[in-house]
Amino acid sequence: VTSETKFDRRNPMGPARDLGLAELREHAMELRRTMMRMASDKGEGYIAQGLGIADMMAVVFNRELIYDPQNPEWPDRDRFVLSTGHYSIALYAALYRAGYLPEEQLDRFGLNGSELALSTFDDVPGVEITGGSLGHGLGQAVGMALGHRLDANDARVICELSDGELQEGSVWESAMVASNFKLDRLTAIVDCNGIQADGPMVINIEPVADKWIAFGWETVEVDGNNIKEIVAAFDRLREANGRPKAIILRTTPGKGIPTLERRERAHFVRVGQDEWDKLHAELEENYV
């Protein structure tokens, strides 16, 4: 999809690209392979979170978003805001697969002087905000959506954030503003994987979906590792007008690699090369 096709780009009753579930699952697998390559070259990283949201990223970048990798600053592009900047490996993999990034940059991921840092920077083509300090992505996404409205631009803004991040009060201030202004071109995707830096979540934020509903958001909760459910959530929310939208994703950190799925301290993975080789093999063995 390029900027030359923008005048027939908005079909409110359908996706940007109508890919089937099998194609989307293959895209998700390729994202996981790409992330594993990047993490094993580095020897460490936030790989578990990236694997957990791979299915969502496959749907968003291959079915939902309108963008032009040859023109990253195209004003009419849909915007994907990664609030959890440490999930950068997932976004870089998606941008590479979408044609934004050259392959050689993947091999330098996270190294000193690399274009692709462990946390996102907005000087990378396709990266909309600089990440790092949590709790700020949704507010920036709200600002983008308001700016689009002022410009009579019907582009969408999709913001990914995490369950741990919901402990930040700024998230709920932003949610309140979005509801007040009826920003129905804004979608929040909340990755609920149950982990924080040192292990499981330390503050109970449940019921997550009910909170977003109470703030006036049209909300759907799904299995975040089930592509069929993710697609159905986007299709259902597409018909909701006059309210911002939220998808609550229940994901498994390390999805697709049983060793990582069972790892309690999965926030930051650091293992030897032999174990990386085993993890690569597990990923291929568990692909169905």
Regions found by a protein language model. Give the residues of each.
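Short secondary-structure boundary/capping segments
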Residues: 98, 204, 261-265
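Thiamine diphosphate
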Residues: 126, 130-241
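Glycine/aspartate-rich loop-and-adjacent alpha/beta segment that forms the canonical ThDP
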Residues: 4-7, 227-288
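N-terminal hydrophobic or amphipathic helices/low-complexity stretches enriched
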Residues: 2-31
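Glycine-rich beta-alpha junction loops
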Residues: 55, 86-87, 193-194, 226, ...
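Structural motif
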Residues: 43-51
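N-terminal capping segment at the start of a domain
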Residues: 28-44, 191-192
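Cofactor-binding active-site loop characterized by glycine-rich and histidine/acidic residues
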Residues: 38, 51-180
